[in-house]
């Protein structure tokens, strides 16, 4: 069996005097399907941010297999530096990624790519943010509440897309 792509072991994190994560562990292997369940404020989003490299734990071990790609979908994406949804979607891609994948996914989700991100509805913003992380087809997708603001049609599209994805989720 191949070693995990991502390992978080004995992760501890406090905010002020409050312990948010104590001994948290997460192992993600190729094509895994993992779901974090817990109450509001229990550290699910923070654990995803640690896995994505956006927050540093107070202690514990994080290991990412060399060459592994990760994309993180935050609850509130930042569109402030982008003129169009296509600009934002393609910003998730790196050299070697198919730039047309972003165009294709935007169209699949009912966006043209010409929308001004500052004028998007909640659902449109969520769809653009999904394209930003889905287009590069990373090894690991970290999705923080991916169906927020989506209508049933977009949720069904996302479920189908993720079922066929080779990314670990």
Which residues does each PLM region occupy?
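ABC ATP-binding cassette signature C-motif
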Residues: 1-169
